[in-house]
Amino acid sequence: MKKALLLVDLQNDFCPGGALAVNEGDRVIDVANRAIEACLDAGVTVIASQDWHPANHGSFAVNANTKVGELGELNGWPQIWWPVHCVQGTAGADFHPALNQSAIQWIVQKGTQPEIDSYSAFFDNGHRVKTELDEWLHANHITHLTILGLATDYCVKFSVLDAIALGYHTEVLVDGCRGVNLSPDDSESALREMAQRGAILTDMTQFLTTLSSVR
């Protein structure tokens, strides 16, 4: 058994003041740093995903001549239209400055194809193209993932569901997640779906206890 901690999209644009701010998104950073510190002590790999859109990305409402938050279709797939966010090379796409970035051993960038969105760290939304994440995890013999980040109901959820489908033992550090919640219960629904599909929902206390067993 070899574990890794996957930090999902802990970027400025998803935190308060950002272009697509998640309520209390910055509160996840302290949880992430505690988890990172524990992983370093236990010799557990720390990796991260980074939303990394070109400026002409098709999911941006301004590029689709639509309104933010409306549901439409992008190249045959359902698409929520988003504000411009996490554009490559901008401050909004950078990781939150309080995050312990020096501990991150590898970063997978996603959402780079302008014609399709990519919530999951493993695939685009159509499951047409894989990112490098699965290959990297296999090359490093990682079989168990703990996932936290932003947002619970989108990029965390779809990363978790893909991880399970690909055969990884997957747990979600719930107190390290916050949701967009276009509908008030979206995050709770996402957590239920993840659990129903086989994810283990955990909190920091349980995570630290479990992590001590791998030392």
Specify the residue positions occupied by each region the protein language model found.
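Active-site alpha/beta core segments
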Residues: 33-144
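Active-site flanking residues adjacent to catalytic metal/cofactor-binding acidic residues
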Residues: 8, 50, 174
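Short acidic-hydrophobic, aromatic-tinged amphipathic segments that line or gate anion-handling sites
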Residues: 198-210
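Histidine-anchored nucleotide/phosphate-binding helix
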Residues: 35-36, 156-167
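Short catalytic helix/loop segments, enriched in acidic residues and glycine
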Residues: 22-37
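A short glycine-rich beta-strand->turn/loop micro-motif centered on a GG-aromatic cluster
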Residues: 146-149, 169-181
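Short glycine-enriched, charge-decorated loop/helix-capping segments at active-site entrances
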Residues: 18-25, 121-125
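Extreme N-terminal starter segment of soluble prokaryotic enzymes
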Residues: 1-5
